[in-house]
From Swiss-Prot:
This is Succinate--CoA ligase [ADP-forming] subunit beta. The gene is sucC. Succinyl-CoA synthetase functions in the citric acid cycle (TCA), coupling the hydrolysis of succinyl-CoA to the synthesis of either ATP or GTP and thus represents the only step of substrate-level phosphorylation in the TCA. The beta subunit provides nucleotide specificity of the enzyme and binds the substrate succinate, while the binding sites for coenzyme A and phosphate are found in the alpha subunit. Mg(2+) binds at N209, D223. NCBIfam families: PRK00696.1 (NF001913), sucCoAbeta (TIGR01016). Gene3D superfamilies: ATP-grasp fold, A domain, ATP-grasp fold, B domain, Succinyl-CoA synthetase domains. It catalyses: succinate + ATP + CoA = succinyl-CoA + ADP + phosphate; GTP + succinate + CoA = succinyl-CoA + GDP + phosphate. Pathway: Carbohydrate metabolism; tricarboxylic acid cycle; succinate from succinyl-CoA (ligase route): step 1/1. GO terms for biological process: succinyl-CoA metabolic process; tricarboxylic acid cycle. Heterotetramer of two alpha and two beta subunits. HAMAP family: Succ_CoA_beta (MF_00558). ATP binds at K46, G53, R54, G55, E109, S112, E117.
Length: 397
């Protein structure tokens, strides 16, 4: 689960992290008042969307101006004017894709004098199953670019859960970033605060880009991106309240309500599969035979007839989908349940596109019998390869 920058900063401030004074507005008429509550003389006006690259992004609408989603203002009135230009407009960045995202919130904060920009992140290292620090002197840049071009400029190390965070972890970060004197002490304290927040709130990633040294020589969190483990949000009512459903794909949101693992993609063949590994293999083989998957959808091992029906509705709600491939290997999942769900869904949505079904495993004969006796135009497949070839042929012709 992702949250906005202003929410991330407010959360980190609760743990003592140094952030700029800021206000969030949803109406243009509130922007001047919000800006006037801060000292100035420089204000930063930031579009709030769940995507990176806002500063380098462009708005679709001409009246939003040529600048990106992060703008500087030298008066409260100018800050209000910039907020008005961006609110309700569509911002396109390298992470949003060409469709972009509508800006419904603007964050106005005090500007900061910047001496140095650095990169810092905490994340779950799946290889070591530990929380890891990642830092670099190359702040304000895309860290993937830094990793590709100058990997030696990135330091990464994990924290042993037996000891937890210790001051030497903070010193290691500080020295790698070239900090000195009081900045080292500030870094040790800040890293501890961030580590505590990460652990207590079940975060998956905490990215600060940039972490800066101000012109007064102090550390400050200038930008923050936080994502939480969706499986742990139930433990944190305060975190759950931060969810902005308008930033989420409606199909992914609907899927989450039925415990379906769904990710929208850009292809034309909808996929419904049980098991993440088989789902990825299904997407791969569709690409192998010359088409593109429209989604990743894992119905899981305990899917009911109702859940399968909802999965079908979600797939068919995507206007890009030109055909559907149902690929089920029934272990825990029974093939007859899948078959009943498929038939019910086809009848309910009035399916008008090719449908290929491959069933194997528990109650497979019952499943095939249900489909064969349904009277529906369903293309049966014997195996994964056969199914992929048939759906690609049906869609491509």
């Amino acid at each position: 689960m992702n949250i906005h920058e202003y929410q991330a900063k407010a959360l980190l401030a609760q743990y003592g992290a140094p952030v700029s004074d800021g206000r969030v507005v949803t109406k243009a008429e509130d922007a001047k008042t919000a800006a006037g509550e801060m000292d100035g003389p420089l204000w930063v006006v930031k579009a709030q969307i769940h995507a990176g690259g806002r500063g380098k992004g462009k708005f679709k609408e001409a009246d939003a101006g040529e600048a990106g989603g992060v703008r500087l203002a030298k008066s409260a009135q100018e800050a209000a004017d910039e907020a008005k230009k961006m609110l309700g407009r569509t911002l396109v960045t390298h992470q949003t894709g060409p469709v972009g995202k509508q800006v419904n919130r603007i964050y106005i904060e005090d500007g900061s004098g910047i001496e140095t920009e650095m990169y810092l992140a905490l994340l779950v290292d799946r290889q070591s199953s530990r929380i890891s620090f990642v830092c670099s002197t190359e702040g304000g840049m895309d860290i993937e670019e830094v990793a590709a071009s100058t990997p030696e400029k990135i330091l990464s190390f994990s924290v042993d859960p037996a000891t937890g965070y210790q001051p030497y972890h903070g010193r290691r970060v500080a020295f790698s970033l070239g900090l000195e004197g009081q900045q080292v002490k500030q870094c040790v304290k800040l890293m501890g605060q961030l580590f505590t927040a990460f652990q207590e709130k079940d975060m998956e990633m905490l990215e600060i880009n940039p972490l800066i040294v101000t012109d007064e020589g102090n550390l400050k969190v200038l930008d923050a991106k936080v994502s939480f483990d969706g499986n742990a949000v139930y433990r944190h009512a305060d975190v759950a309240s931060l969810r902005d459903e308008t930033e989420e794909d409606p199909k992914e949101l609907a899927a989450s309500k039925f415990d379906l693992n769904y990710i929208a993609l850009d292809g034309e063949i909808g996929c419904m599969v049980n098991g993440a590994g088989l789902a990825m293999a299904t997407m791969d083989i569709i690409k192998l035979y010359g088409a593109e998957p429209a989604n990743f959808l894992d119905v899981g091992g305990g899917a009911t007839k109702e859940k399968v029906t909802e999965a079908f509705k979600i797939i068919t709600s995507d206007p890009q989908v030109k055909g559907i491939f149902v690929n089920i290997f029934g272990g825990i999942m029974r093939c007859d349940i899948i078959a009943e769900g498929v038939i019910a869904a086809v009848k309910e949505v009035g399916l008008q596109m090719p449908l290929v079904v491959r069933l194997e495993g528990t109650n497979v004969e019952k499943g095939k019998e249900i489909i064969n006796n349904s009277g529906l135009d369903v293309i049966a497949a014997d195996d994964l390869k056969d199914g992929a070839q048939k759906i690609v042929k049906a869609v491509k012709g």
